Amino acid sequence: MINSIRIGTRNSPLALIQTNLVIQQIKQFFPDINCAIVPIITSGDLIQNKPLYDIGGKALFLKEIEQALLDKKIDLAVHSLKDVPGRIPEELVISAVLEREDPRDVFVCLNYKSIKELPQHSVIGSSAVRRKAFIQKIRPDLKVTIFRGNVDSRIKKLMTGEVDATILAYAGLKRLGAFNPEYCHLIEYSHMLPCVGQGVIAVEIRQNDNSMLEICNQINHLPTCELIKPERAFLEYLDANCRTPIGTYSQYLDADNIQTDFMLGNPDCSKITFHTEITNIKTSKEGGIKAAKMMLNQLKK
């Protein structure tokens, strides 16, 4: 058995917290393994003044980390699953996920509790086309402006009046200890579907690395692993980029069946379609693909 692991991750406060959560899981099963964090600055971290869809999408948060994996400079990588494209290099595999945190989005605003309450022509900071699509559906009068940066910097921009409100993932706020109920308000799934895989911490390794696979098999949270399959299959089939508004939310109906709500829009957010699919866990991937095909056809009509 190996005695040390090099774990690659982004150098942001949230990424480091999430990596330590993975290390805690590893230590539960392999207390004698030494885990060394290797912080990696990614292209997505360096370019903050442009929306992701103009500079290569969320894959920019993975590119340098995955290259370090391929070059064997690290042994495994930790990601927010919502940042992982539907298709990754064939030499790599998402081999484990931790238990999913509440995947809902949060409306962050000092003076109002919901998007509907905002005064006319207020400014919401968000660079996600998914969130923009929902905002435009609820309040077409609002202005959505580019809003990049880590959670702390976005909240600081809000506090200084750069925008009237923003929308962030609850999971990140909770892990950072930054969820403040005075100005953080959960958005229900019926009002805004989360991003694919939102709330899930993922572990990526090389396909043929049996030592890492053994570790990942132990820390993998199987119920979450099954839950995200239809969401990931939907994303992979669409081969979508950051210009395509996509939302998904999966939940167990019982021990054997999963319900997934899907949202898909065209790039300019002028048309959005919704669909709900119920599948057995054994066929949940097929359910995601079926939904993608059906919704693509609906958008073309």
From Swiss-Prot:
Cofactor(s) recorded in Swiss-Prot or TrEMBL: dipyrromethane
Positions bearing S-(dipyrrolylmethanemethyl)cysteine: 242
Domain of life: Bacteria
E.C. number: 2.5.1.61
Pathway in which the depicted protein is active: Porphyrin-containing compound metabolism; protoporphyrin-IX biosynthesis; coproporphyrinogen-III from 5-aminolevulinate: step 2/4
Entry keywords, A to Z: Porphyrin biosynthesis, Transferase
GO biological process, one term: protoporphyrinogen IX biosynthetic process
Molecular function in Gene Ontology: hydroxymethylbilane synthase activity
Subunit structure: Monomer.
Additional information: The porphobilinogen subunits are added to the dipyrromethane group.
Job of this protein: Tetrapolymerization of the monopyrrole PBG into the hydroxymethylbilane pre-uroporphyrinogen in several discrete steps.
Name of the protein in its database record: Porphobilinogen deaminase
Organism for this UniProt entry: Rickettsia akari (strain Hartford)
Lineage of producing organism: Bacteria, Pseudomonadati, Pseudomonadota, Alphaproteobacteria, Rickettsiales
Encoding gene, per UniProt annotation: hemC
